């Protein structure tokens, strides 16, 4: 059984204001920036990434349409790299890290990107029925 290790991390600034600089920045743009820099710091060829797994508590509206795939593309990964969005609400990002490590340990691949994304100001809190 292979061991899974985290070789790089990156995150975007955490904002507490609905009026902040990143207020209306799309989650895929923020996520793409973080993924691009995590891969660069790790010294990994982007083509080596098997899959991008992203947790998202509100995967609808601006963060819908498989935001993990959008992040992969905005991070500059090749179009051959797939993306999967996981919705487990508060534990979505942690779940993707567990899933990526399980896939590595099971021998299903070697390089995965896993994490979470949310741009809550771009998602309506209470959509109309």
Task: Please give the residue ranges for each predicted region.
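Flexible glycine-/small-residue-enriched beta->alpha junction loops
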Residues: 2, 105, 109-129
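N-terminal amphipathic/basic leader segments beginning at the initiator methionine
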Residues: 1-16
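Active-site/binding-pocket entry motifs
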Residues: 11-13, 77-78, 119
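Phosphate/pyrophosphate-binding loops at sites that engage ATP/ADP/AMP, CoA/4′-phosphopantetheine
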Residues: 37-50
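Active-site pocket-shaping loop/turn-to-helix segments
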Residues: 14-40, 58-61, 84-98, 121, ...
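Conserved catalytic cysteine-centered active-site region
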Residues: 56-109, 122
């Amino acid at each position: 059984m292979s061991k899974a290790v985290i070789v790089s991390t990156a995150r975007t600034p955490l904002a507490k204001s609905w009026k902040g600089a990143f207020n209306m920045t799309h989650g895929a743009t923020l996520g793409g920036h973080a993924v691009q820099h995590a891969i660069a710091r790790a010294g990994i060829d982007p083509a080596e990434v098997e899959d991008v797994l992203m947790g998202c508590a509100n995967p609808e509206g601006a963060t819908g349409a498989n935001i993990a795939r959008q992040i992969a593309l905005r991070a500059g990964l090749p179009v051959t790299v797939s993306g999967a969005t996981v919705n487990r609400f508060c534990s979505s990002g942690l779940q993707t890290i567990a899933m990526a490590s399980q896939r590595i340990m099971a021998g299903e691949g070697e390089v995965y990107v896993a994490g979470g994304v949310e741009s809550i100001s771009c998602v309506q809190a209470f959509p109309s029925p």
